[in-house]
Amino acid sequence: MSTFENKTAIISGGAEGIGLAIAHAVGARGMNVVIADINPDQLRIAEAELRQAGIPVLAAELDVADLGQWQDVADQAVKRFGKVHMVVNNAGVGGSGGTIEETDPKTWQWVLDVNLMGVVYGTQVTVPLMKAHGEGGWVVNVASMAGFGPLPLATPYTATKAAVVAMTEGWSLELAPEGIHACVLCPGFTQTRINLSERNKPARYASGAGAGSGAAKQLDGALKRVVDEGMPSNVVAERVIEALESKEMYVFTHPSYRPLAQVRFNAANAAFDRAAQSPLLAEYVNLPLPDFSQE
């Protein structure tokens, strides 16, 4: 029997890209699939595609920035399939590129609400359902390699993806005793439409801001090219399956991107070395690490 057979997954941003590819991957292994997406037209297309593949599927509209909508989707999932065993917090947006001055507050709020709070809400709603049935489960949070290093002129995006990595690290420790495995997917450039995410921006985030700088427009053009030439989404999805079966916490898809992460780690190591050599800190060099397990 498959690890996933007869279990149920809720996948946000499930109507296309990585979300739809994961729906196919887990569905092919016997899972019931709930695809939730803000785009109703794309949702209907994806639902038909999954049904054609013989996958039990429920399609539900979802704005991940709305906690009430998350609760509605979870209720629909339980009503249809009985239990929820997996959440894939995949929905994400890029936001328009720009400098500090050019990135308006509504762009920040949109990216924070979707990329960060959407993950928080999805996890807060589904984890109690997994704990209730006691059969274990999975929390799969989709971040990005941008969570390990800066992407020029895309600070809201990189900040939220770094936050998703940090949240998953904490949740992994918290949920492991419950038999719930939390992991964070950090793909490199993949064939999705993340560079076109403005098309799904709700009216409440409209800013009326003017066009970005020439540098931002150049970045947008470069992003389109690398996304179009990126890894196929189905390869990313199969990598997720592989990682879930081996209980990996950090799920990387592009081994050649290792140097991007090492820039931060190497810089941190060098900064610690400088701190250790500071006369101001001489008496603190050998302080023990705090032990939070003690009462």
What is the meaning of each model-derived region?
Residues 98-100, 104-110:
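Substrate-binding pocket helix/loop in short-chain dehydrogenase/reductase
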Residues 40-41, 60-72, 105:
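The beta1-alpha1 cofactor-binding region of Rossmann-like NAD(H)/NADP(H)-dependent oxidoreductases
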Residues 177-255:
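SDR active-site lid
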Residues 144:
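Residue(s) in the substrate-gating loop at a strand-loop-helix junction
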Residues 123, 160:
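Active-site helix of classical SDR
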Residues 29, 149, 170-180:
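Active-site-adjacent segment of SDR/Rossmann-fold oxidoreductases
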Residues 2-34:
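Canonical Rossmann dinucleotide-binding motif of NAD(H)/NADP(H)-dependent dehydrogenases/reductases
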